[in-house]
């Protein structure tokens, strides 16, 4: 598929959009900077005055480090405020209100639908299939729904939140082939570090209707820093950058994120991912033995989706033990389910102890 094809999916009124030219986008040189109406003095709370100036909109060092981490070119990567901003940019950049649909696969991360509704884009839901191997995406049905609705965006969460299932690359490629020139397939890999399925980023060389979301919030333990990456066709990335807020990456967050991508920090992250995967298996095996647990779904994320005979009682028992989990009961088709993040071994033991005590007291 040619580069022009993916840009044909962009809203007509945005293809030549220049965006806002901030003071940091100029190539001017000097040692006295009086072009952005910044303070000439630092704040007492900022002893080295490092935050008195506006940040680099796309910090070069961080962008290069993220590109190396994910295996793409820097110009194929956009840094934003978590994956949420990237989702919003994609919807606003591609979808004409009341015309261009967005396909989602519930139960799934809610921000895809939120952004679609804020843009007044038609929302098409293709529910995950609850089978013997867990809740999984039916890719042929998703593709047909996208074609029928003339959708511009198809969001595939892999591993899926809260289901925990991952989509094989061969199935993602089926969607990319079928939707060439028609829709961008967005693969959300927020939990990719915990998965056995390789990243879809490797498919970008063949399919420019692919976009991949990554984050430092989960495996890299920087949720408060809000560092998300959108990896896609370079021309699409440039367009979405023009649609983005002028200064999306605060300097302190960029500095911390770049430090988190150093070799020593990445080695620690990898060890923790290995520990989480081991704890995920241990907790899964233990939960299926707990009376009152109806089903524990297999997971490729850092969490488990669990169905209970009495989810309210389980939720309250965990709260009484000081353990807060994600209540899924208001989510369609998950009225008996809780999502439990994989914690430390001690935290996971508290989960098991609380649920076992609940059953003993019943």
UniProtKB/Swiss-Prot annotation:
**Where does the record place the modification N6-(pyridoxal phosphate)lysine?**
218
Q: Which GO terms describe its biological process?
A: L-histidine biosynthetic process
What catalytic activity is recorded?
L-histidinol phosphate + 2-oxoglutarate = 3-(imidazol-4-yl)-2-oxopropyl phosphate + L-glutamate
Pfam families, sorted: Aminotran_1_2
Recorded metabolic or biological pathway in which this protein acts? Amino-acid biosynthesis; L-histidine biosynthesis; L-histidine from 5-phospho-alpha-D-ribose 1-diphosphate: step 7/9
Instruction: List the InterPro entries hit by this protein, alphabetically.
Output: Aminotransferase_I/II_large, HisP_aminotrans, PyrdxlP-dep_Trfase, PyrdxlP-dep_Trfase_major, PyrdxlP-dep_Trfase_small
- UniProt subunit comment: Homodimer.
Which HAMAP family does the record cross-reference, listed alphabetically? HisC_aminotrans_2
> Family per UniProt?
Belongs to the class-II pyridoxal-phosphate-dependent aminotransferase family. Histidinol-phosphate aminotransferase subfamily.
What is the recorded name of this protein? Answer: Histidinol-phosphate aminotransferase
**Which source organism does the UniProt entry give?**
Xanthomonas campestris pv. campestris (strain B100)
